[in-house]
């Protein structure tokens, strides 16, 4: 997956779709009560990016629905996965609970709406395992509003770069043992040299353990240099989050990588393990 980073308005979304990205990451902000508000990152953000792009969440979800509904004039076949990077900083337990509930409501009302034909997969990406109440509330609300079958299109991710054994225990408490993406990364402003790759290697090794259920895919973020992308591919990542989707796709298409990998399409289930 070539995951376009920080896709927070319609113009940049179109630009990344034209580049060929098959996934996007969108930042979702919340009010202090936990109400989903808009697609917005704000400052600081990645180097060489404009941090203040924004659009209201209802309009954004409706637009995504158009882009991912076959037969719609705006349909873009290449958009498979949407990573919702949830900005939950400082929310109380009650606000986290409300946030999960309200995000489920908004997906039902503005993305799937009446016919449920919009086909993108969503990754509900929570910053910290201590904010797991959001996931619990989100899953419960989908069932209560009779959208439980859409759970087939929902995955989960914690992005705190913590020890995954602890993350697994949180998933066990939540009753989640599938549709799990794991990630490792750092802002593009800091060289990968300072971050290192040991945790990324550990996640990939854990994913590949026979019978292991708690990691379906591993992605790295935010990789904008050829050396970093090439290293990630050599390690066996399933996705690269980047500010330059066409650049990553170009590297993927080089003979040394295309013999093993190709860009994922809608026919490739993002919750199934890939076996080379």
From Swiss-Prot:
Lineage: Eukaryota, Metazoa, Ecdysozoa, Arthropoda, Chelicerata
Disulfide cross-links: 45-51, 47-189
Comment on bound cofactor: Binds 1 Mg(2+) ion per subunit.
Family membership: Belongs to the arthropod phospholipase D family. Class II subfamily.
UniProt record, GO biological process: killing of cells of another organism; lipid catabolic process
One annotated Gene Ontology cellular component of this protein: extracellular region
Obligatory cofactor(s): Mg(2+)
GO molecular-function term, one example from the UniProt record: phosphoric diester hydrolase activity
Catalytically driven reaction(s): an N-(acyl)-sphingosylphosphocholine = an N-(acyl)-sphingosyl-1,3-cyclic phosphate + choline; an N-(acyl)-sphingosylphosphoethanolamine = an N-(acyl)-sphingosyl-1,3-cyclic phosphate + ethanolamine; a 1-acyl-sn-glycero-3-phosphocholine = a 1-acyl-sn-glycero-2,3-cyclic phosphate + choline; a 1-acyl-sn-glycero-3-phosphoethanolamine = a 1-acyl-sn-glycero-2,3-cyclic phosphate + ethanolamine
Record keywords, A-Z: Cytolysis, Dermonecrotic toxin, Disulfide bond, Hemolysis, Lipid degradation, Lipid metabolism, Lyase, Magnesium, Metal-binding, Secreted, Toxin
Cited function: Dermonecrotic toxins cleave the phosphodiester linkage between the phosphate and headgroup of certain phospholipids (sphingolipid and lysolipid substrates), forming an alcohol (often choline) and a cyclic phosphate. This toxin acts on sphingomyelin (SM). It may also act on ceramide phosphoethanolamine (CPE), lysophosphatidylcholine (LPC) and lysophosphatidylethanolamine (LPE), but not on lysophosphatidylserine (LPS), and lysophosphatidylglycerol (LPG). It acts by transphosphatidylation, releasing exclusively cyclic phosphate products as second products.
InterPro entries in UniProt: PLC-like_Pdiesterase_TIM-brl
Binding site for Mg(2+): 25, 27, 85
Uppermost EC category: lyase
Major localization listed first in the record, in broad terms: secreted
Name recorded for this polypeptide: Dermonecrotic toxin LafSicTox-betaIE2
Active site (catalytic residues): 5, 41 (nucleophile)
Enzyme Commission number, as recorded: 4.6.1.-
Tissues where this protein is expressed: Expressed by the venom gland.
Subcellular localization(s) per the UniProt record: Secreted
């Amino acid at each position: 997956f070539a995951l376009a980073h920080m896709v927070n308005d319609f113009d940049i979304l179109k630009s990344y779709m034209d580049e060929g990205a098959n996934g996007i990451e969108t930042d979702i902000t919340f009010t202090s009560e936990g109400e989903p508000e808009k697609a917005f990152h704000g400052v600081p953000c990645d180097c060489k990016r404009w941090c203040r792009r924004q659009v209201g969440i209802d309009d954004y979800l409706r637009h995504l629905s158009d882009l991912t509904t076959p037969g719609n004039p705006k349909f873009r076949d290449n958009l498979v996965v949407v990573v919702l990077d949830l900005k939950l900083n400082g929310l109380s337990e009650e606000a986290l609970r409300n946030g999960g509930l309200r995000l489920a409501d908004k997906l039902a009302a503005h993305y799937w709406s009446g016919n449920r034909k919009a086909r993108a997969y969503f990754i509900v990406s929570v910053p910290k395992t201590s904010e797991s109440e959001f996931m619990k509330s989100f899953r419960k609300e989908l069932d209560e509003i009779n959208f439980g079958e859409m759970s087939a299109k929902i995955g989960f991710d914690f992005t705190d770069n913590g020890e995954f054994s602890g993350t697994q225990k949180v998933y066990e408490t939540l009753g989640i043992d599938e549709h799990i993406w794991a990630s490792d990364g750092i802002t593009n402003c800091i060289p990968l040299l300072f971050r290192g790759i040991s945790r990324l290697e550990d996640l990939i090794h854990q994913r590949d353990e026979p019978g292991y259920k708690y990691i379906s895919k591993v992605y790295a973020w935010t990789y904008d240099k050829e050396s970093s992308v090439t290293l990630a591919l050599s390690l066996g990542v399933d996705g690269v989050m980047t500010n330059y989707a066409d650049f990553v796709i170009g590297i993927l298409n080089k003979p040394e990588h295309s013999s093993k990998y190709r860009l994922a399409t809608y026919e490739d289930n993002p919750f199934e393990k890939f076996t080379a």
